[in-house]
């Protein structure tokens, strides 16, 4: 059983998946920082200078005026946290765009490699048996005349 597990782990696709998950987690941290530290402050300037991710509406309950989203949640109030949601949407769009560009680049590389292999296979294959026999026949006819 240990041997099977070792073979399973040693497969390239499992290791690739693990590397992808680790890089994805690191990339998510970068995107979260990009949104929280760069994009949200700019949006905040456009919307009155407040932290955009902390914007919310109180649906039910009592919340002191000007309280943060965390204070509103801690007080037990029902809140519509549209700022946090929009931040999550921005995060998603940035990650989706980056993944799209990555997949597009990988597909381009794979396509180029595939075309190169096809060209090499055609060049290495040379003439078919039928083509060789036709050439021999034509050569023999040319010698007879």
Swiss-Prot record:
It is found in: Cell inner membrane. GO terms for molecular function: mechanosensitive monoatomic ion channel activity. Its main location: membrane. Pfam families: MscL (PF01741). One of its GO terms (cellular component) is plasma membrane. Gene3D superfamilies: Large-conductance mechanosensitive channel, MscL, domain 1. The chain crosses the membrane at residues 14-34, 83-103. InterPro entries: Mechanosensitive_channel_CS, MS_channel, MSC/AndL, MscL_channel. Homopentamer. Belongs to the MscL family. Channel that opens in response to stretch forces in the membrane lipid bilayer. May participate in the regulation of osmotic pressure changes within the cell. This is Large-conductance mechanosensitive channel. It comes from Paracoccus denitrificans (strain Pd 1222). The gene is mscL.
């Amino acid at each position: 059983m240990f041997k099977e597990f070792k073979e399973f782990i040693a497969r390239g696709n499992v290791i690739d998946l693990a590397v992808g998950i680790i890089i994805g987690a690191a990339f998510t941290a970068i995107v979260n920082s990009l949104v929280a530290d760069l994009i949200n402050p700019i949006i905040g300037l456009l919307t009155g200078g407040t932290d955009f991710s902390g914007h919310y509406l109180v649906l039910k309950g009592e919340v002191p005026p000007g309280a943060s989203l965390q204070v509103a949640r801690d007080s037990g109030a029902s809140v519509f946290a549209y700022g946090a949601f929009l931040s999550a949407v921005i995060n998603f769009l940035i990650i989706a765009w980056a993944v799209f560009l990555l997949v597009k680049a990988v597909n381009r590389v794979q396509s180029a490699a595939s075309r190169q292999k096809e060209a090499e296979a055609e060049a290495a294959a040379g003439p078919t048996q039928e083509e060789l026999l036709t050439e021999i026949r034509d050569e023999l006819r040319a010698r007879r005349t």
